[in-house]
Amino acid sequence: MKISSRTAYITVATMGIVSLFGDVVYEGGRSLIPEYLKFLGASAILVGTVTGAGEFIGYILRLVSGSLADRTKAYWVFIFLGYGLIAVVPLLGLAPSYEIAIIFVILERVGKALRSPSRDAVISVVSKGIGSGKAFGLHELLDQIGAIGGPSLVAAMMFWSSNNYSSTFILLFIPFAALVVALLYAYKKVGRNVQPEVKEAAKGNKRLDKHFYLYNVAIGLSTVGLIPVALILYKGASIVEPSQQWLIPVLYVVVQAVDAPIALIAGLAFDRVGIKMLVLPLAASFLPMLFISYGGLTEVILACIAYGVVLGMQESIYRAAISGLAPAGARGTAYGIFNMFLGLGVIVAGPIFGLFLESQLMILPLAYVAVTQVAAIFLLLQSTKHTPDEEISL
């Protein structure tokens, strides 16, 4: 069975447009969540813990949803349910306390858990004719246009409304409506056409070998040593004046603006170099903590740029590598497992880096990051000693 390059490009592009509108909503909201929780009374440790816990719950659920998607072949059902839960982001504007806001934050992560494995499985299956690196890089590029637009919209609204959190979040109902329209169009345009091909590809070999698991342990360990972007923004919020809090979403825009082109460039390079390309983002994961350890707002901006570089490669080539390590019949499960290991790293990193920020012990976190990334690189290189048992034919 062969999926044409034209079908592959159309599928990746339409799914990218859906993700674009999704990112306008949830990345716009997420750019404001750290300082919003702080405004509602949450501490740095709580923000770090909630960020990590929300990500972890979402990632664990991806293992379940990915496995269910492989078993039921109902990939588009999970995609629709997952994108539908983005509605909780505008509802943050109605939260009366940080406890309620935390529930909404976690629900948004649940939605991402439902949609991500199925969406990535669909993209990975159709990417054979154009290259998995290019496919995920292109998808991430479109995705990041929304990720830039969302925080920009939020920053403008915060400035215009004199830092009115409620009005800013409620405004996000408008792009959410556009998301619903785009998703319905995407399913009508390509969903029905590629669904039979995705189902057919998913009938094959479902075995995941030790190299796949070594890779995932490496990714999880690297994430343990990467400071969460929420805490970079929290650091920024503690530096700027109260009247300048609208600058924090702008910092998040910087992250996404760097992420977008890096994702496509890294994806194209991955198709040429292969999985060893991942040594670069693992090594670069040291930089964000280095920058915020010394200095003020300028260093926070540099940390955002460095984080954007890592994130761009993470969102494209981390995902693309799964295509070469997992057979098509287990892609939903494989992406679920991948995200579970990623989530284990996030849940550990959140409170650890939160403690580092509050303790202001800068040498210790730098040593911690260096050790975790070196160990992750070692495991990654071990996972590359892999000759596939079969060429994954789609």
Predicted region positions:
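Transmembrane alpha-helix termini and helix-breaking/packing motifs in multi-pass membrane transporters
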Residues: E35, F39, G149-S167, V348-L364
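Structural signature of the two symmetry-related core transmembrane helices
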Residues: V77-L91, F173, K276-F291
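Helix-loop boundary and gating motifs at the non-cytosolic
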Residues: K2-E55, Y213-E241, Q245-L251
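Cytoplasmic helix-loop-helix junction between adjacent transmembrane helices
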Residues: F104-I145
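Helix-to-loop junctions at the C-terminal end of transmembrane segments
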Residues: L61-K73, M158, I262-G274, L357
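C-terminal transmembrane helical hairpin of 12-TM major facilitator-type secondary transporters
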Residues: G274-Y318
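Symmetry-related core transmembrane helices of the 12-TM Major Facilitator Superfamily/SLC fold
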Residues: S167-L184, L364-Q382
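Helix-loop junctions at membrane interfaces in 12-TM secondary transporters
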Residues: Y9, L92-V105, S293-A303
